[in-house]
Swiss-Prot record:
Taxonomy of the source species: Bacteria, Pseudomonadati, Pseudomonadota, Gammaproteobacteria, Enterobacterales
Function: Toxic component of a contact-dependent interbacterial competition system (also called effector-immunity systems). Secreted by the SPI-6 type VI secretion system, probably into the periplasm of bacterial target cells. A cell wall amidase with specificity toward the D-meso-DAP-D-alanine bond (D-meso-diaminopimelic-D-alanine) found in peptidoglycan of Gram-negative bacteria. Toxicity is counteracted by a cognate immunity protein Tai2 (t2585), but not immunity proteins associated with a similar endopeptidase in other bacteria.
Keyword entries, A-Z: Cell wall biogenesis/degradation, Host periplasm, Hydrolase, Secreted, Toxin
BP term (GO), one: cell wall macromolecule catabolic process
Enzyme class: hydrolase
Keyword Secreted: yes
GO CC field: extracellular region; host cell periplasmic space
GO molecular function: hydrolase activity; toxin activity
Xref: InterPro entries: Dae2/Tae2-like (IPR047746)
Protein name: Type VI secretion amidase effector 2 protein
Protein EC: 3.4.-.-
Native source organism of the sequence: Salmonella typhi
Principal subcellular localization: host cell
Family: Belongs to the cell wall amidase Dae2/Tae2-like family.
Amino acid sequence: MPYVYANAKALQDTEKVGNHHQCVELIQHYIRVGQASTWQQGAAVFGNKNIEVGTVIATFVNGRYPNHNSGNHAAFFLGQDTGGIWVMDQWKDDIAKPRVSKRYIRKLHNGSVRSDGTYIRMSNNAEAYFIVE
């Protein structure tokens, strides 16, 4: 069952939240999703026409959220087109993104999956996102 925060669009230009301004802290601040280590990989996001605005999405490796300091990401889904997905997120160290804001994540054109099943540039690869369950 997906987690959905109905007011995700209203977060545009709000202050970052959490002690470290991590992406997961944004999700946990607005909706009860538990610890990221308990998250389960659901359906793929890119190309899925049945995702509700505000659905929690994240990058996964072998069905689990990696929970590393960098290289993985979580966000609220806002929409998509043929080139990528729109999300509402926060980035801890991005000075160009000082507040919670909308971001477009493109589908990579040079192949997106490695031979071990991990995704190239996961945080910036539309095909690497899945619904959190």
